[in-house]
UniProtKB/Swiss-Prot annotation:
Gene that this sequence comes from: 7
The protein's name in its UniProt record: Capsid assembly scaffolding protein
Origin superkingdom: Viruses
Region (Disordered): 77-98
Subunit annotation: Homodimer. Interacts non-specifically with DNA; probably binds DNA in the early stages of DNA packaging.
SUPFAM superfamilies (UniProt xref): Head morphogenesis protein gp7
Pfam families: Scaffolding_pro
Length: 98
């Protein structure tokens, strides 16, 4: 887990001290190096996760679109079928009127 921004800033400010002993300077630089490594690792993991989720989202959008089109076609076919049933119905009034 990368350092908190405040902790990172604290280490950088500590390194500005010209009287800082070499051992503490080395330790601070090592902390920054480790922090950078963990930051890059976490960034790469999050990038891969984001790419995977974006691809899944795109697949879901396509699937959803297909389902809506299929439902739309089914509903239209049902409406057409109902209209056809109604138009084929002959009543006694229709026969008497002709």
């Amino acid at each position: 887990m990368p350092l908190e921004p405040e902790k990172h800033e604290e280490i950088l400010n500590m390194l500005l001290d010209p009287e800082l002993p070499q051992s503490e300077r080395t330790e601070a630089l090592q902390q920054l190096r480790v922090n950078y490594g963990s930051f890059v690792s976490e960034y790469n993991d999050l990038t891969k996760s984001h790419e995977k989720l974006a691809a899944e989202k795109d697949d879901l959008i396509v699937s959803n679109s297909k389902l809506f089109r299929q439902i739309g076609l089914t509903d239209k076919q049902e409406e057409d079928h109902k209209k056809a049933d109604v138009s084929e119905t002959i009543t006694i009034e229709d026969l008497e009127g002709k």
